[in-house]
Amino acid sequence: MARAKFERTKPHVNIGTIGHVDHGKTTLTAAITMTLAAAGSAKARKYEDIDAAPEEKARGITINTAHVEYETPNRHYAHVDCPGHADYVKNMITGAAQMDGAILVVSAADGPMPQTREHILLAKQVGVPSLVVFLNKKDQVDDEELLELVELEVRELLSEYDFPGDDIPIISGSALMAVNALIDNPNIKPGENEWTDQVLELMKAVDDNIPEPEREIDKPFLMAVEDVFSISGRGTVATGRIERGKVKVGETIEIVGIRDTRSTTVTGVEMFQKTLDEGMAGDNVGLLLRGIKKEDIERGMVIAKPGSITPHTQFEGEVYVLTKEEGGRHTPFFKNYRPQFYVRTTDVTGTIQDYTADDGSAVEMVMPGDRIKMTVELISPIAIEQGMRFAIREGGRTIGAGVVSKILK
């Protein structure tokens, strides 16, 4: 049996379902795959398959996530759904499953709940660019005015966290009714059932409102330096994996981080001992750099397109602190705690200056298992940018995972 080839004919977009526990995220995920399977462009996945999500490890943290894929007439989607609330927090912060957009599921019967707010805040902090809302459990609400009220509440909540609350599409329906209809008749066609039609309407809103992500290869060039060699007669070679963009022989690049930024020319690109004209996102390459001595460059610096990234020492981060069971600390930590921040390829010591709760109030003590916003001051400047992931380590073990939510200086 030959392996199925991945046909890349449609643009690919990564999305996920977010929202409060028991509002129907997993049921909706099942409803989407079943509805699109009936329309001929997905493999139907039952609720049970999705809910029994396998464990994965991302940056040393165990997360349960279910991955399903499906297609609309215009796009191919990879969809992530997490069974537990803690899994969502960990997934969004570590970027284990990157989301180009998300479907926020809100129960029409209950309205926005604490985790609805928390997931919207997280989406904002970790840089999920666009949301579409599904008001679920519509079959449990008889009063049209109540639906309108919940919709208004959701829009206000979105606006509060700087999403365009007035413009985000809100589709109402019932994931469970759609699933039940499809169990009775797996071949429902568009126009035959109001509940499955609402799921199709939701997917059309996702198609139209969640923009296609910019491909890694189209972004400005960046490679984090992993190792440095000196080749006699040729000069200095820095090796690493190209994170984004592409680099050609003869191009000017900048070396950023730890010391003053320097500019030089790439005189060679090598991969597996072969010379290339250019290296691109995903390649592990060695770059030969003109006029750079071995001691001028070290692991932890980045090589990038001039002007595309700058070194910083102070930032705000949204952090998940590992529990004792996850291999994290057993005890709390306080202000002026000085762990290492593992950024791309290196550990940099930093001091945590303060902690802030979701409501903006100051927090004195951080416990294992907490999610917290912190302000960090690094001892040396490092190339960092908003949305970048990092780990917090202490004596070589990971005690937290975070994402840069704001650069301060």
Swiss-Prot record:
Key word Metal-binding present: yes
Enzyme Commission code(s) on record: 3.6.5.3
Binding positions for Mg(2+) per the UniProt entry: 26
Top-level taxon of the source organism: Bacteria
Binding site for GTP: 19-26, 81-85, 136-139
Stored PROSITE patterns: G_TR_1 (PS00301), G_TR_2 (PS51722)
Positions of the UniProt region annotated as G2: 60-64
Annotated GO MF terms: GTP binding; GTPase activity; translation elongation factor activity
Start and end residues of each tr-type G domain: 10-214
Disulfide bond positions: none
UniProt-listed NCBIfam families: EF-Tu, PRK00049.1, PRK12735.1, PRK12736.1, small_GTP
Subunit structure: Monomer.
Protein known as: Elongation factor Tu
Organism: Crocosphaera subtropica (strain ATCC 51142 / BH68) (Cyanothece sp. (strain ATCC 51142))
Gene: tuf
